[in-house]
């Protein structure tokens, strides 16, 4: 068990950002969900309204006491309400650190667009020229979550 690991940026489904052509959420899921999170006390305006997907293999995220957990978020009519947790994190890229959040839609309430168990979705400020294949170092608050193999 650890609270820090290196991972590789991987392509996501494009649904969170609204880039997926076949998505019913043209604005992007994060943009649609943000007002619901704000109403529950979490402001996302410091972050790009898209996720950075990082494969931490062989590590996978295990929630402990996330900073925020919101149950039964009714953000769309396309599917039933979802539960989301957010874990505070720091990401280091080329020696520069930025604060962000692990965005964790609970798989048991997420009807589609599942990620492999070793992939975490991050909400971060815009990182210039970030590309798939880049290595990032993820640091979690160990009280909120851990990484296990």
Can you describe what each PLM-predicted range is?
Residues 1-2, 125:
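An N-terminal domain-start capping segment
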Residues 2-78:
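Anionic-ligand-binding alpha/beta catalytic cores of soluble enzymes and soluble regulatory domains
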Residues 12, 105-106, 141:
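Fold-independent oxyanion-binding glycine-rich loops
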Residues 70-129:
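Glycine-rich active-site loops that engage anionic ligands at enzyme catalytic sites
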Residues 124, 140-142:
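Conserved "cap/hinge" positions at secondary-structure junctions
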Residues 133-138:
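Loop/turn positions that initiate beta-strands
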Residues 143-149:
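Short, Lys/Arg- and Gly-enriched loop/turn segments at beta-strand edges
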């Amino acid at each position: 068990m650890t609270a820090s690991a290196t991972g590789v940026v991987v392509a996501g489904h494009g649904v969170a950002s609204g880039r997926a052509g076949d998505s019913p959420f043209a604005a992007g899921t994060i943009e649609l969900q943000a007002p619901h999170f704000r109403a529950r006390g979490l402001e996302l305006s410091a972050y790009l309204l898209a996720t950075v997907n990082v494969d931490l293999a062989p590590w996978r995220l295990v929630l402990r006491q996330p900073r925020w957990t919101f149950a039964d978020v009714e953000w769309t009519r396309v599917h039933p309400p979802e539960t989301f947790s957010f874990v505070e994190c720091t990401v280091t890229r080329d020696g520069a650190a930025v604060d962000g959040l692990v965005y964790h839609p609970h798989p048991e309430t997420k009807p589609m667009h599942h990620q492999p168990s070793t992939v975490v979705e991050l909400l971060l400020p815009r990182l210039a020229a970030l590309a798939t294949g880049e290595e990032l170092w993820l640091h979690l608050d160990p009280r909120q979550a851990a990484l296990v193999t």
